[in-house]
Amino acid sequence: MRAERLSPLLALGLLVAGIRSVHCLPENVVVKDRHRRVDGHTLASSNTDFAFSLYKQLALKDPNKNVMFSPLSVSMALAFLSLGARGPTLTEILEGLKFNPTEIQETQIHQGFQHLLQALNRPRNQLQLSVGNAMFVQEELKLLDKFIEDARVLYSSEAFPTNFRDPEAAKSLINDYVKNKTQGKIEELFKDLSPRTELVLVNYVYFKAQWKTRFDPKHTEQAEFHVSDNKTVEVPMMTLDLETPYFRDEELGCTLVELTYTSNDSALFILPDKGKMQDLEAKLTPEMLTRWRNSLQPRRIHELYLPKFSIKSNYELNDTLSQMGIKKIFTDADLSGITGTADLVVSQVVHGAALDVDEEGTEGAAATGIGIERTFLRIIVRVNRPFLIAVVLKDTQSIIFLGKVTNPSEA
């Protein structure tokens, strides 16, 4: 007899929205508690490893489709869920998140996420970033006091009584909450909910920043983007002449350009040589990302051509997570740390993401002469074929977005 047919259901919603322009926050904000960032850094390696593992699974499903997701959102939601997991279920989640339970204690992991969450949500100059968690609980469901307290203290989770026996009303309540938290970028996280649902855990991320050196819309023109050998589309192509971190990786056959936001966070664009995308994807590792970031050097790019795009994605992650070793939560889960009984299973894990990249931003005082190594070669970078993008928050080294743009003309 299959457990998932009998057990009350739990659903995870994970979402992120990101866009590119921002209104500056007051410049006299003082950042305190520097030690918290150190705790955040201890998670960076595992989170990056998880990010690339999840990316590879999503990219394999359809190599010709756009991929866009937030590793930070997915990993934080699963860590939140693990608060209530016990035994092999807990071990699977932690190992799936690329932690070694024999080397790091569960409490250290949760405290690390707690400090990371606090670091991400502190007031920042020139960046709007909001990360949060919420629980939607069936009205008569009794949660353990310890789970409620840990969810509040470690994951800053809000809790909302919900009547899942009216699934349409419950869906509207959750989707409206998500829409509000993401400034309208994610409108329908859940397309349906079972009336047997008992609990929904939601993690959201909202990111809004502007380029340090903006693209001039007057220079944006329609240009060809080569989706594949036999398919070309017309897209708005932005162009810029600037000095920015750049690296040509001859070993892997790719070009890297890092564009910074006014907040000094950055977007790393990785452009494989023609026919090299799958080879590059197979070699994505945390060590490779570290090597790339250490190899980036300021260069004058005389002509940078970058497509303007707006991509939304929605994923059901049940099968994907199972392939990554996180299986028990969907079948014979032990989530007794939530209610005291082992009768909950996860019915669905959904993830929504939205990322806009366009010309908007302020022209910041980018360093143009100090520490800049000039080159006599004229560097031209045309991002006119499928590429990878990683948006990285500088102080915590968190990958907030990771994706592949195969066709910028597809929303």
Swiss-Prot record:
Cellular-component GO terms for this entry: chromaffin granule; cytoplasmic vesicle; extracellular space
Q: Which UniProt keywords apply?
A: Cytoplasmic vesicle, Glycoprotein, Protease inhibitor, Secreted, Serine protease inhibitor, Signal
| PROSITE patterns cross-referenced by the UniProt entry | SERPIN (PS00284)
Q: Where in the cell is it found?
A: Cytoplasmic vesicle, Secretory vesicle, Chromaffin granule; Secreted
Which residue positions does the secretion signal occupy? 1-24
Pfam families, from UniProt?
Serpin
| UniProt cross-references to SMART domains, sorted A to Z | SERPIN
- The keyword Signal is annotated on this UniProt entry: yes
Site (Reactive bond) found at: L377, R378
One annotated GO molecular function is: serine-type endopeptidase inhibitor activity
Residues listed as glycosylation sites in the UniProt record: N180, N230, N264, N318
Q: Which domain of life is it from?
A: Eukaryota
Name the PANTHER family for this protein.
ALPHA-1-ANTICHYMOTRYPSIN (PTHR11461:SF145), SERINE PROTEASE INHIBITOR, SERPIN (PTHR11461)
Q: How does it assemble?
A: Homodimer.
What the protein does comes down to: Serine protease inhibitor.
Q: Which family does it belong to?
A: Belongs to the serpin family.
Q: What is this protein called?
A: Serpin A3-4
Provenance organism: Bos taurus (Bovine)
Q: Gene name?
A: SERPINA3-4
